[in-house]
Swiss-Prot record:
Protein name per Swiss-Prot or TrEMBL: Protein preY, mitochondrial
Keyword DNA damage: no
Organism of derivation: Bos taurus (Bovine)
GO CC aspect terms: mitochondrion
Intracellular or extracellular location(s): Mitochondrion
Gene3D superfamilies: 2.20.25.10
């Protein structure tokens, strides 16, 4: 059973890797002089999107419950605890201290509506 899960995880991760040429270019780029901010902004690729296939394997580190992906805010949401983990460049930041509370926002909206 565990080997099947590991195989599916490995398969999902293989699909998210950058091509070797991009990695090689980054290494060469890092060893050369640093470009100006204007040039770097024009040549950088847009941030990578989150691969939703990983939701099968990711759980909240606090409750061990499945998470829901919210594309509009680019976060992984734990409805039960009312927290949202940010996703930066396609990588979820699952550190509990980095999560934001979502229940407080809902309570404030309810108070403002009444």
């Amino acid at each position: 059973m565990l080997s099947g899960v590991c195989a599916r995880l490995a398969s999902a991760l293989r699909g998210t890797r950058a091509p070797p040429s991009a990695v090689a270019l980054r290494c060469l780029h890092a060893s050369s002089s640093r470009p100006s901010a204007d040039k770097r902004d024009r040549t950088e690729k847009p941030p990578r999107a989150f691969d939703q296939a990983l939701l099968e394997f990711l759980v909240c580190p606090l409750s061990k419950k499945p998470l829901r992906y919210e594309a509009s805010t680019n976060e992984l949401i734990n409805e039960e605890l009312g927290i949202a983990y940010p996703i930066i460049d396609g990588i979820p930041n699952m550190i509990p201290q980095a999560a934001r509370m979502t229940h407080q926002n809902k309570k404030q909206e309810e108070v403002e509506q009444h």
